[in-house]
Amino acid sequence: MLINYLMLLFAAMIIRSFADSGNAIETTSPEITNATTDIPAIRLCGPEGDGYCLHGDCIHARDIDGMYCRCSHGYTGIRCQHVVLVDYQRSEKPNTTTSYIPSPGIMLVLVGIIIITCCLLSVYRFTRRTKLPIQDMVVP
């Protein structure tokens, strides 16, 4: 801990001697006088891009030269020329009221298993109660 205090004291002495000697570094920066205008990263093409994109908007990107298409929903491709085919059965949300109701066949099987199990248990208990005690067999 004493070493940390000595290092801190030594660093403060070096900084003070450097500042007193007149060798201080000027850290102020000159003011910027010319104003810069922000160019949006993506902008619409304008009249030169009319008809370029078949199903979407023609755009210019700031970093890339050329025209590009931002496709409307349901279209894809370089010029939005391809239709995206959607499988409607997979895209629909499941009907929550019917998706959690078990089918009648499954219910019948479960009820049948429960009834058979109850019958077997009752037969087992009945035969266990009425069983005659085993008599010791004596051999003459």
From Swiss-Prot:
<dbReference type="GO" id="GO:0016020">
    <property type="term" value="C:membrane"/>
</dbReference>
<feature type="disulfide bond">
    <location>
        <begin position="71"/>
        <end position="80"/>
    </location>
</feature>
<feature type="transmembrane region" description="Helical">
    <location>
        <begin position="101"/>
        <end position="121"/>
    </location>
</feature>
<dbReference type="GO" id="GO:0033644">
    <property type="term" value="C:host cell membrane"/>
</dbReference>
<feature type="topological domain" description="Extracellular">
    <location>
        <begin position="19"/>
        <end position="100"/>
    </location>
</feature>
<keyword id="KW-0732">Signal</keyword>
<comment type="similarity">
    <text>Belongs to the orthopoxvirus OPG019 family.</text>
</comment>
<keyword id="KW-0945">Host-virus interaction</keyword>
<dbReference type="InterPro" id="IPR000742">
    <property type="entry name" value="EGF-like_dom"/>
</dbReference>
<dbReference type="GO" id="GO:0005154">
    <property type="term" value="F:epidermal growth factor receptor binding"/>
</dbReference>
<dbReference type="GO" id="GO:0008083">
    <property type="term" value="F:growth factor activity"/>
</dbReference>
<comment type="function">
    <text>Stimulates cellular proliferation (hyperplasia)and mobility around infected cells to promote rapid and efficient spread of infection. This effect is beneficial for virus replication in vivo, because poxviruses replicate possibly better in proliferating cells than in quiescent cells. Acts by binding host EGFR, inducing its dimerization, autophosphorylation and leading to activation of several cellular pathways regulating cell proliferation or cell survival.</text>
</comment>
<feature type="signal peptide">
    <location>
        <begin position="1"/>
        <end position="18"/>
    </location>
</feature>
<dbReference type="InterPro" id="IPR011170">
    <property type="entry name" value="GF_C11R"/>
</dbReference>
<feature type="topological domain" description="Cytoplasmic">
    <location>
        <begin position="122"/>
        <end position="140"/>
    </location>
</feature>
<feature type="disulfide bond">
    <location>
        <begin position="53"/>
        <end position="69"/>
    </location>
</feature>
<feature type="glycosylation site" description="N-linked (GlcNAc...) asparagine; by host">
    <location>
        <position position="95"/>
    </location>
</feature>
<protein>
    <recommendedName>
        <fullName>Pro-vaccinia growth factor</fullName>
    </recommendedName>
</protein>
<keyword id="KW-1015">Disulfide bond</keyword>
<dbReference type="GO" id="GO:0008284">
    <property type="term" value="P:positive regulation of cell population proliferation"/>
</dbReference>
<keyword id="KW-0325">Glycoprotein</keyword>
<keyword id="KW-1133">Transmembrane helix</keyword>
<feature type="site" description="Cleavage (By host protease)">
    <location>
        <begin position="96"/>
        <end position="97"/>
    </location>
</feature>
<keyword id="KW-0245">EGF-like domain</keyword>
<keyword id="KW-0244">Early protein</keyword>
<keyword id="KW-0964">Secreted</keyword>
<keyword id="KW-1043">Host membrane</keyword>
<feature type="disulfide bond">
    <location>
        <begin position="45"/>
        <end position="58"/>
    </location>
</feature>
<dbReference type="GO" id="GO:0007173">
    <property type="term" value="P:epidermal growth factor receptor signaling pathway"/>
</dbReference>
<keyword id="KW-0472">Membrane</keyword>
<feature type="domain" description="EGF-like">
    <location>
        <begin position="41"/>
        <end position="81"/>
    </location>
</feature>
<keyword id="KW-0812">Transmembrane</keyword>
<feature type="glycosylation site" description="N-linked (GlcNAc...) asparagine; by host">
    <location>
        <position position="34"/>
    </location>
</feature>
<dbReference type="GO" id="GO:0005615">
    <property type="term" value="C:extracellular space"/>
</dbReference>
<dbReference type="GO" id="GO:0045840">
    <property type="term" value="P:positive regulation of mitotic nuclear division"/>
</dbReference>
<keyword id="KW-0339">Growth factor</keyword>
